[in-house]
Amino acid sequence: MKGVNIYKPLDRAAPVARFIDGLDPKLRDKLIHWLIELPNTPKASLKEPHFKHFALERYRDLYELRARGKVLVRVIFTIRPNGEILLLHAFIKRQSRDTMQALEQAVSIMTQVRDHPELATEYTVKEEGT
């Protein structure tokens, strides 16, 4: 079943969910719109400017959802073999090196989830404007 899952450490709230909830309402609504559409979007349609698929071997399983408002917001995610989306890491891009740091963190999280599947929980995307 396709859906959106989110990385949630056992001892605290899901970092990506907290990040999204803390955004400016207009930008949050834009990001949530893309998250609602994401499970039904074919891989071939995940192209710039709203998405980026990383080509380097180490990051080839990772994608980036891009939203722009007053700031540049990025959400790193992967598509699991069963078609589910797994949101790994979110950040505000201020410098080009921010992406590399986020990718490294996303790879680390992906490894944790592979070893401990219970760290991936269903993410209920709130409807826009709520």
Description of each model-found segment:
Residues M1-L72, P81-I85, I92-T130:
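Basic, Lys/Arg-enriched alpha-helical interface segments
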